[in-house]
Amino acid sequence: MKLQGSRMWLCPRTRLPVGASALGFLILCWLYVFPGYRLPGHKEMVREVLRFGPGWRKNRTEMDSFRKLLQDCCDPPHLFSLTKVNTPLGENLWFDGEFFHSLTIDNSTRSLFPQDTPFKLPLKRCSVVGNGGILKNSRCGEQIDEADFVMRCNLPPLSREYTEDVGTRTQLVTVNPSIIDKRYQNLLWSRKSFVENLRVYQQSYVYMPAFSTKRGTDPSLRVYYTLADFGTNQTVLFANPNFLRNVGKFWKSRGIHSKRLSTGLFMVSAALSLCEEVTIYGFWPFQMDLGGRYISHHYYDNTLPLSGVHAMPEEFLQLWLLHKSGVLQMQLDQCKKDVSSQKPH
């Protein structure tokens, strides 16, 4: 415990300054502990989490302050998805993941957008569910489902073997176009199986970055037309590239250096503006849990992400600072303890 991690004890847990200064104070404290922008390793991060302890208290002042920052930079209530209101006919829509590529909005494309933001805002309590292996055996399913609005990322499995840990309810699920290409052959031959697999997400919004890269447009449009042809009760929303671009700039200014943010961080960013309270699950980018046990990368498999695309430890650090300052709650331990493993009193 005398490693550099012991310097964490110099950072106070409570009585932080109020307003936007509190988060800045935490960042300065972290830079003192890890000078030269050295990211903490797994063991150091575990010490930090365990030192902070299980207690968490929301800070309404900090919540409102951070929500205003997101509103000023990115306007999620208005720009989260493409709508007829925010995307006029004839607009030159620039893709956020391609240099110098744009699409002129015509009647055909604009007809795919809802009239306005479909959510009744503000949303109350939101669960944002990442897919991290730390969710396995977490028994967080019931707690996740208690939220008013549940966001999930990239079509995660919700079969019976996982529901105790991740729940069953979904109000919004994201779909990376690469999933449509690799798993469903771009819906050229697998439309029926795709529709059947999406039934587990019930009457949810399906959120896709159709206008981020040229390669993502066709698969996203195929999803829209497939769900329409089969008369499903799901609604496709297309991510607004202006929103994605601005969120990327927002986090880059706060020290996240990556080619692209993870889907999870995009969703958390949206939730912090759209929801009154946010709890996040499955956000833990390390190979061992808080008890020192090895865990898989996802709760359902151990497929690793492409190297060099995301900066998951940097993202986690920012989310952890928001947890400490009371802006959001990060669930890293079991939601329900395993009674069979506890000693009788």
Swiss-Prot record:
Name of encoding gene? st8sia1
Name the source organism.
Xenopus tropicalis (Western clawed frog)
Q: Which Gene3D superfamilies match?
A: Glycosyl transferase family 29
Q: Which GO terms describe its biological process?
A: ganglioside biosynthetic process; glycosphingolipid biosynthetic process; protein glycosylation
**UniProt: CMP-N-acetyl-beta-neuraminate binding residues:** 131, 154, 262-264, 284, 298
Q: Where does the source fall among the domains of life?
A: Eukaryota
- Which residues participate in substrate binding? 154, 176-178, 262-264
Q: Which reaction does it catalyse?
A: an N-acetyl-alpha-neuraminyl-(2->3)-beta-D-galactosyl derivative + CMP-N-acetyl-beta-neuraminate = an N-acetyl-alpha-neuraminyl-(2->8)-N-acetyl-alpha-neuraminyl-(2->3)-beta-D-galactosyl derivative + CMP + H(+); a ganglioside GM3 (d18:1(4E)) + CMP-N-acetyl-beta-neuraminate = a ganglioside GD3 (d18:1(4E)) + CMP + H(+); a ganglioside GD3 (d18:1(4E)) + CMP-N-acetyl-beta-neuraminate = a ganglioside GT3 (d18:1(4E)) + CMP + H(+); a ganglioside GD1a (d18:1(4E)) + CMP-N-acetyl-beta-neuraminate = a ganglioside GT1a (d18:1(4E)) + CMP + H(+)
Q: In which pathway does it act?
A: Protein modification; protein glycosylation; Lipid metabolism; sphingolipid metabolism
The family line of this record is: Belongs to the glycosyltransferase 29 family.
Which loops or segments lie on the Cytoplasmic side of the membrane, by the record?
1-15
Q: What residues sit in the active site? A: 310
- InterPro entries, per database record: Glyco_trans_29 (IPR001675), Glycosyltr_29_Sialyltrsf (IPR050943), GT29-like_sf (IPR038578), Sialyl_trans (IPR012163)
Which cystines does this chain contain?
A: 126-275, 140-335
Q: What is this protein called?
A: Alpha-N-acetylneuraminide alpha-2,8-sialyltransferase
Report the top EC class in one word: transferase
May I ask which residue range the UniProt record assigns to the signal sequence? Answer: none
What EC number(s) would the UniProt record show?
2.4.3.8
